[in-house]
Each structure stands twice: as structure tokens, then as C-alpha cells.
């Protein structure tokens, strides 16, 4: 496939953002909704029928103030005006949901908004922590097909996610910490640049609670990377890839770690692995890396 044809295909592929899931009425905030949001984001990250589009890339535009994000995650804010949001961000699909946990089981009510068709599709799913969150995935994939976005690359979205309830809750707390850092940014700080560092306590606790969790290792890698700890971030991403060799987030993290130390060969290796995982053009990945090494004009 030529680059021009690939660009044309990219234009045709829609974008989908997974919003943080909210606890059902009566269930206190525990971080699990954000952990589940991260899980579904990683499932859809390898969907080759969609353009790559992460909530974290848009979090500051969706929730420009930290209190807006924290209120939404705790169920104190309604879902934003979906038509206006979709038009402004040029994102067609938005997945939202509520959850409740009963022992080992997590019950989800999901809604997929299609801003182009001005429609909303719903599904109820149950996931089990004891089976690597595998039960319910095929039902979710089948539902996406009925919504007009059949999953391309299902085999890459079937890793066993070995995370405990505590690990999932700590994961969500860590993710909220990361998102709040994205929203606040260094420009909004009134003190030294050192305060831009993320407190990694929740990230570490998630890994300690669920050492064999791809999601926990991957998120810890991003926290370390954001703090400038490239060597430790790379180690965390490598641990994540041992658990899920096609984890799109960890592949991206390894690429950015390589770029950070001017390792062109390493950056190209992981950029092309990531592109291959998503069914994207390998030469486009090469061009992306080449541009990072071009001398400024």
C-alpha cells in the first residue's frame, strides 16, 4: 500500500474515545472506573479499523479544569454535550459507562455514542477478575460490529490481564494523577519546575498489588517517563511487553524512550512494531522517526 493510499485510509477511519467510567449509584469512588477505562482504551488501541485516539490526548480540552475531571470521575458531573464535543474534537465515537463490583465480578453498562448518526447503542457486560478480564471481551467485540465498527485485529486484544481488584483500583488512582498533571501542566504552576513531577505512589502500589498486570506495568512506565526517568520507564515498559507483546501503549512508550536518548535504531524498531500491531504503514512509521532526527531549520 502506498503512503498516499494509506493516508486516504486514515481519513476514512473514525476515531473513538473511551471516557472514564463512573460508579453506579451507591458505589463509592474507588478508582476502578478509571482502571476499566484504561483497560478498554488499551483494547481499542489495537483496533485497526479506528484511528489511534487516546483520552489522555484530549483530557485538557474535555476537562479544562482539574475539578471538572475529578467531579466527573466521581459521578458528580453529567456526560458533556456529546454533539458539541464530537464536533469540536472531530471524534465520531464516544464510549461511556457505569460499573459496580460484586466480589470477583464487575458489571458494566456501556453506551457508545455515534455523533455522525446521532445515535446511542447500549450493552450490559460482566467481567471477571479471576479469568484475566477475558470473559465479556468477545461479547464486546460482537457489539462493536453491530455498532458499525467491527473489530480489526481481535487476536491482539486477547491478552490475559492479571490484575486484582486492589490493583485495578490503584491503577485508576494513578491514572487520575497522570490526567490531572496533564490538565494542570507546568504553565499553571506557581512554584518551581520540580513540582511538575508526578507522585508515583499509586502507580507503585498498583504494580505491587498486581505484578503480572500489563496495565499496571505500562502505566507505571508512563508515569516514570513523564518524570524524566527514562531508564526506569524503559524497564517498566519492557516488563509490560513481557506480559503482552502487542501492548500498544508499551510499544509507544519504548519508542519515546528511545527517541529521548537519541537511539534512532531503537525508535524505528518500536515505531514499526507499533505500526504493524495496528495494521499501519511501516514506511510511515519510518518517516515519523526520521523527522524526529532532522536538524531544525
Which positions does each model-derived feature cover?
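Structural marker of alpha-solenoid helical repeat scaffolds
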Residues: 209, 243, 276-277
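Short beta-strand->alpha-helix linker/helix-N-cap micro-motif
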Residues: 9-83, 94-103, 115
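A structural "domain/chain start" motif
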Residues: 1-46, 171-190, 222, 231, ...
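Amphipathic beta-strand/beta-sheet edge segments enriched in Tyr/Trp
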Residues: 75-145
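C-terminal/domain-edge helix-coil "capping" segments
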Residues: 1-11, 116-212, 216, 223
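TPR alpha-solenoid repeat register
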Residues: 216, 250, 284-285
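Residue-level recognition of tetratricopeptide repeat
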Residues: 213, 247, 281-282
